[in-house]
UniProtKB/Swiss-Prot annotation:
This is Azurin. GO terms for molecular function: copper ion binding; electron transfer activity. It comes from Pseudomonas fluorescens biotype C. It is found in: Periplasm. Keywords: Copper, Disulfide bond, Electron transport, Metal-binding, Periplasm, Transport.
Amino acid sequence: AECKVTVDSTDQMSFDTKAIEIDKSCKTFTVDLKHSGNLPKNVMGHNWVLTTQADMQPVATDGMAAGIDKNYLKEGDTRIIAHTKIIGAGETDSVTFDVSKLKADGKYMFFCSFPGHIAMMKGTVTLK
């Protein structure tokens, strides 16, 4: 099983995938986030954040107040399973997390916590 995925983000407020499947044989899983757009991170920054489906909106709402220096995520938020930093045009960041943090029957979402982006920039994470 390939225990990693590359996710591209754009100036059109989109990720190039809406669903990520993680093989349960993976001990860790890595997400490489790219930004193929032209706009800087203060204008069109993106990150990749993993939470349960139930926690997604509250985490994003709390994150807005945190500001860009904190990657639009509340510091020490235990609801966040994994996240990258906010990146802009031409930048990349990656995050590796422990697959044991996910339950087989759990509902998980990935999203961008940059203010206003969650409506367009989200998808499911499934343990298979």
